[in-house]
């Protein structure tokens, strides 16, 4: 978890700490969390914010990795001791991406995937959050997208963006339903049909040509299937115009009626 400072407090000073438990059953005699263990930090003038941590227990060798950071600077990677939860002695952080935040790591079929949230947040329907991905044969990188652009240079293949009257998807999470079946979580900065409130998104996690794709949540209705080989694309140039909305903060109680936002 992250503590104080960083993007949470308006500065660049932050910490990532871990607490470990042998069981999640509160009735077990082994149920007891360790004291907080600091595994990463950032100073006021550092080009990284030590928040937004993500963990990967490598299925190939049992090593434990933690990524962290925000769009204020670099995304960094450190190795932890899976037996103690502490930072591996002498471990030096590695820069693996830039211009994103809230990263997470996945291993699949010989590839390590780094998913990060790109764009701006915290402005309701005007937020531009989207989730991108790069991959590497090594957990330490370099991570590149489908066009060969390095994530250390701002690259990233799109996984999910705004759509269906929801905007600003960010903070990827993985949930394995069964062998070969997985779902992804994110939060949308604004749902236009809920007055611009932030909502949880759950999508099927699909794979296409070796890349993760956010599936659609299909509803009853009539659908049109378009051929990839002969489909058409429409390119638009759009001027940004702010959308007026009432700000709803997730940490405050809000009993106001839910009113859909008007189309822009």
Walk through the language-model features, giving the residues of each:
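Lectin-like carbohydrate-binding module/patch detector with strong preference for beta-trefoil
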Residues: 221-264
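Glycine-rich, flexible loop segments associated with nucleotide phosphate handling
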Residues: 31-33, 128-130, 167-168, 254, ...
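Short, solvent-exposed secondary-structure boundary motifs
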Residues: 42-46, 93-96, 163-164, 225-227, ...
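Beta-rich carbohydrate-recognition and catalytic domains
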Residues: 1-51, 57-98, 107-112, 117-160, ...
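Beta-propeller and closely related beta-sheet repeat lectin domains
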Residues: 51-54, 101-104, 170-173
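Active site of divalent-metal-dependent phosphoester/diester hydrolases
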Residues: 152-174
């Amino acid at each position: 978890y992250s503590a104080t400072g960083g993007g949470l407090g308006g500065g660049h000073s932050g910490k990532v700490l871990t607490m470990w438990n042998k069981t999640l059953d509160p009735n077990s005699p082994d149920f007891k969390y360790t004291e907080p263990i600091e595994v990463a930090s950032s100073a006021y003038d550092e080009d990284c914010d030590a928040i937004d941590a993500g963990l990967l227990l490598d299925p190939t060798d049992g090593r434990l990795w933690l990524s962290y950071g925000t769009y204020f600077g670099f995304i960094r990677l450190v190795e932890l001791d899976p037996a103690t939860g502490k930072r591996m002695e002498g471990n030096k952080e590695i820069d693996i991406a830039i211009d994103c935040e809230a990263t997470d790591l996945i291993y699949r079929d010989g590839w390590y995937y780094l998913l990060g949230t790109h764009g701006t947040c915290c402005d309701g329907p005007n937020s531009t959050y989207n989730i991108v991905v790069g991959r590497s044969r090594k957990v330490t990188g370099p991570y590149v997208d489908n066009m060969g652009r390095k994530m250390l240079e701002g690259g990233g293949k799109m996984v999910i963006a705004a759509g269906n009257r929801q905007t600003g998807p960010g903070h990827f999470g993985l949930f394995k339903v069964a062998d070969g079946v997985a779902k992804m979580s994110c939060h949308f900065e604004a749902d236009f049909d809920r007055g611009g409130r932030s909502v949880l998104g759950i999508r099927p996690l699909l794979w296409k040509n070796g890349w993760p794709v956010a599936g659609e949540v299909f509803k009853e209705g009539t659908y049109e299937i378009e051929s990839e080989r002969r489909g058409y694309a429409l390119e638009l140039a759009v001027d940004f115009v702010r959308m007026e909305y009432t700000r709803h903060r997730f940490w405050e109680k809000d009993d106001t009626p839910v009113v859909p936002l008007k189309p822009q």
